[in-house]
Amino acid sequence: MKKEFKVIAELLPNNTRVLDVGCGDGSLMNFLKEEKNIEVRGLELNQENVQQCIHKGLPVIQGNAETELHQFPDQSFDYVVLSQTLQAFYNPEQVLKNLLRIGKSVVVSIPNFGYWKVRMKLLFFGEMPVTKTLPNTW
């Protein structure tokens, strides 16, 4: 389990409704459900990740957050979590506005782009590194 999951869980009260945008394989949702009795729902673009969530019994919708968040009603969740995903959006400002509309509060975590290895890879190769915590290329 990622250390980040514990930090996010500490920010969320028990027994709340949480939307995890860019939920990946559902690991964070599963952790929040088990540890905090949180009612979770995910939104994920990748079909394989959606299938993993379904296999784990987690409620997930396949969709693109940039084009489909408008379908969620205002204040329909207590919290919205956006974990390690913001950097992948073409229009992050619009995504954040939608998250603030959907949830009463929003928790956002981003990769540490100041880490020297990340900066060196960007400088010398012009690309973001692929790691265990950021396995997707973009």
Where does each model-flagged region fall?
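Alpha-helix C-terminal capping/helix-to-coil transition sites in glycosyltransferase folds
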Residues: N14, Q75-S76, I102
